[in-house]
């Protein structure tokens, strides 16, 4: 009889240890996703912020220039990605604390709120930039806006590529919110 009750006690403690392992795994995944989102937002902000192209027109003295700062939407894109990148970098130590102390509830709740705010910032920046990129490629016949990508092809390729990192960061922030919700629900 005594042997069977001891066996039952050990089996009750096994899920508790595995719960800590799962919690630590969630925290490690949180840290990895933050690094990926940092890379995406940083690359997008730098690439967009350094995008420009100059085309000569008849002579060397008359030139047409396209740069990201010509469009306020693309400037907002750079600012939004820079802010989100700075936040994600500053949140790394807190994410490391969650790996060490998986029971930190209030700091995880703070990260949920701030992650949601950063998602709310990067989403309109990326979406508005996507609309401008679409107009640059296709134009708008009704508004008499011509597509500029036939002339400024390098500029258009670069601003199109910048969207990838930003939309990737959006996905990472959504996954971070889901992971934090899972971690908070387990407590």
Curated annotation (Swiss-Prot):
Residues 49-75, 137-162 are extracellular. The chain crosses the membrane at residues 28-48, 76-96, 116-136, 163-183. Residues 1-10 have a biased composition (Basic and acidic residues). Residues 1-27, 97-115, 184-187 are cytoplasmic. The keyword Membrane applies. Disulfide bonds: none annotated. One of its GO terms (cellular component) is plasma membrane. Its main location: membrane. Glycans are attached at residue 52. Pfam families: CASP_dom. Residues 1-20 are annotated as: Disordered. Regulates membrane-cell wall junctions and localized cell wall deposition. Required for establishment of the Casparian strip membrane domain (CSD) and the subsequent formation of Casparian strips, a cell wall modification of the root endodermis that determines an apoplastic barrier between the intraorganismal apoplasm and the extraorganismal apoplasm and prevents lateral diffusion. Homodimer and heterodimers. Belongs to the Casparian strip membrane proteins (CASP) family. This is Casparian strip membrane protein 1.
């Amino acid at each position: 009889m005594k042997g069977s009750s001891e066996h039952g006690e050990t089996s009750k403690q096994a899920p508790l240890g595995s719960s800590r392992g799962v919690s630590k795994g969630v925290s490690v995944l949180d840290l990895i996703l933050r690094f990926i989102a940092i890379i995406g937002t940083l690359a997008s902000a730098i690439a967009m912020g350094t995008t420009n192209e100059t085309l000569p027109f008849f002579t060397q003295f008359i030139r047409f220039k396209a740069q990201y700062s010509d469009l306020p939407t693309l400037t907002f894109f750079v600012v939004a990605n820079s802010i989100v990148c700075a936040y994600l970098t500053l949140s790394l130590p807190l994410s490391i604390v969650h790996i060490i102390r998986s029971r930190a509830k209030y700091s995880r709740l703070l990260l949920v709120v701030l992650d949601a705010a950063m998602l709310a910032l990067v989403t309109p920046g990326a979406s508005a930039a996507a609309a401008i990129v679409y107009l640059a490629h296709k134009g708008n016949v009704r508004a008499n806006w011509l597509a500029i990508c036939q002339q400024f092809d390098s500029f258009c390729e670069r601003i199109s590529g910048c969207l990838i990192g930003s939309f990737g960061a959006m996905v990472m922030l959504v996954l971070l919110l889901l992971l934090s919700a899972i971690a908070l629900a387990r407590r």
